[in-house]
Curated annotation (Swiss-Prot):
Highest taxon, organism lineage: Bacteria
Biological process annotations from GO: cellular response to starvation
Protein name: Uncharacterized protein Rv2558
Family listed: To M.tuberculosis Rv2557.
Amino acid sequence: MPGSAGWRKVFGGTGGATGALPRHGRGSIVYARSTTIEAQPLSVDIGIAHVRDVVMPALQEIDGCVGVSLLVDRQSGRCIATSAWETLEAMRASVERVAPIRDRAALMFAGSARVEEWDIALLHRDHPSHEGACVRATWLKVVPDQLGRSLEFYRTSVLPELESLDGFCSASLMVDHPACRRAVSCSTFDSMDAMARNRDRASELRSRRVRELGAEVLDVAEFELAIAHLRVPELV
């Protein structure tokens, strides 16, 4: 991973890679809003600093926001900022306040933004992430009426195998809200080197388990975890 100047990574709380959203009790779900920005690679460091110094403090002042994370791919310029919310009502109530914050961030990254909303179905953490952590994200097409079975299979069969991968830190599974037709599985690892070492095993695991999960892989990407500031507990 190339070095970067002019900014520092922000790590705090106990969150995973993508703003994973837990239940605070049975039936209570935290929600996420992700903003994917196709940034200009030369603007990535500027964008990271803006999210750290401007976006994160602004969101922390909005009722119901429980954290922010940022994934970046310096080569492609794809960056994903995720905010976590205690309730669906809080997330929806924040729309007007968040919109100009998001638009300004997109300008700093010199790219266009796409917004999506998610439920967090699962979050498991072996240990908190630290500077240098990286994330492998897998986007999946899922069948809504089989979602319950798929989530249980992920919890009981996929998570134990993810835990065995070199450098495993945490894993989360988010499902798009409200359609429940897509999911994204994110695994956080201690370093880019660790993620590179487990790439072949992860590919084999993905090919084998996705079929059993009843899902279809739409995309796989690896990111630097530039900001992880999430105040969320574990959900398994």
